[in-house]
Amino acid sequence: MASPAIELRGVTKRFATPKGGIYTALRDLTLDVAAGEFCAVVGPTGCGKSTTLALISGLELASAGEVRVEGRPVKGITDGVGYVFQNDAVFPWKTVLENVAAGPRYHGAAGRDARVRAREWITRVGLAGFEDRYPHQLSGGMRKRVGLAQSLINGPRILLMDEPFSALDVQTRTLMENELLSLWSSTSASVVFVTHDLEEAIALADRVVVITAGPGTVKGTYEVDLPRPRNVAEIRFQPRFSQIYEAIWSQLRDEVLVSYERQKHAAAV
């Protein structure tokens, strides 16, 4: 059996607080993601979902346990990993073409080759004709398309996505979710997609992982046995979608309530 693309084994992550204390974001978290799998991660606010992505990417190192990507221990920034953040990560002073070409240029591509590849990806994400626009001249959905092109142009074997569509309106979000599935289907990348939206997680993923209220650990994993290719709007009306939703929500709801009670208590102190 092939090794997982991503392995987290008994991972704990602690941070120092400004007052000299210790905050534990993750505790004894174990998770595998297979090569080519689309894995969604859901959990209440503050459960360590984004921290998990940071550990996989090498932006943060585990306090205990082990993180491996493609069989190798993560000891720093991980090669072959793309990251799409919740907030726009475009350079405001660069055009769409310059933003998308920046990755290949950083990796040593000649300027002309980088621009040719950038134009190809700009077309693939539906932004042909906008190459010379600046980020402030684009809508939120268009900037997200730029972000996808920025990540995918580098051919990542692993794509990490941290609530990338959360700030978009419902209609644009649906379009972007379908766009993501279309682009992903043409690659062999493993995806770890963090979201607060359980419906989004089920519509996109092969498997949904539920994280407990912090310190986060895996509470359960659920296979999403819905056919592909999918239309994320239409798939929600299938009876099986509702069954999967109810099964996951029955576990996720308790963690959301725990997190909510903690927030109320903290606000009252």
Question: Where on the chain are the PLM-derived regions?
Answer:
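Helix-to-loop junction immediately C-terminal to a conserved catalytic motif
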Residues: 57
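Conserved ABC ATPase "signature" region
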Residues: 105, 112-130, 182
